[in-house]
Amino acid sequence: DPEMSRGLGDVYKRQVWYQLVELMKKADSRVKLHTPYIICNDYMYEGLKSVCDSVDDVSLMTNSVANNGNPFGSADYYVNKNRILGTGIDVWEYEGGYSYHGKSVLIDDNISVIGSFNIDMRSAYLDTELMLVIDSKDINRELNRSMEGYEMVARKADKDGSYDNPYNVKPVELSSYRERQMKLIKNFALWARYLF
């Protein structure tokens, strides 16, 4: 379990996540994240909560359980959705019919962060990931426009299991195959969730 690691390598591997959290906490009004899947440990949940405690408007868009192309990411989101919502973040579930794979962050109206980092333990601890930070209102505006196009095919998840659906999005149906796959992963493979 990467949470138990205390080696110097662990400190370096967590730098991208740490720097992202610190950057997001400095936002004046808004943080918007897009990630294909979200698989966090306690350290990462604490980071998200600290951002939500510092900034009024924090949202995240990720694939819905049925729309996610990564069965492990789908199963982990299914199991941990309430914990994610418990950080205070607004979660939007993408229902576009194909798995969304964007990885970007908007901070206020000038900072854009684009790269290869998923909000998951694999990106934080195992893989070599990069995120480019750009201070430009023009790029921020263009990225926001692109992100909003995807968000118009998403529903906002509520803690009680219901959804706000301002764009009248029809959710992707969870296939029986995906449901069986998720049950297997949930029961037998989530112990290795930091590898997914």
List the model feature ranges, each with a label.
Residues R6, V113-I185:
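Signature of lipid phosphatidyltransferase scaffolds
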Residues K13-L20:
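A short, well-structured juxtamembrane/interface segment
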Residues L33-H34, S59-L60, N70, D90-Y94, ...:
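Acidic/polar loop patches that form or flank catalytic/metal-binding clefts of enzymes
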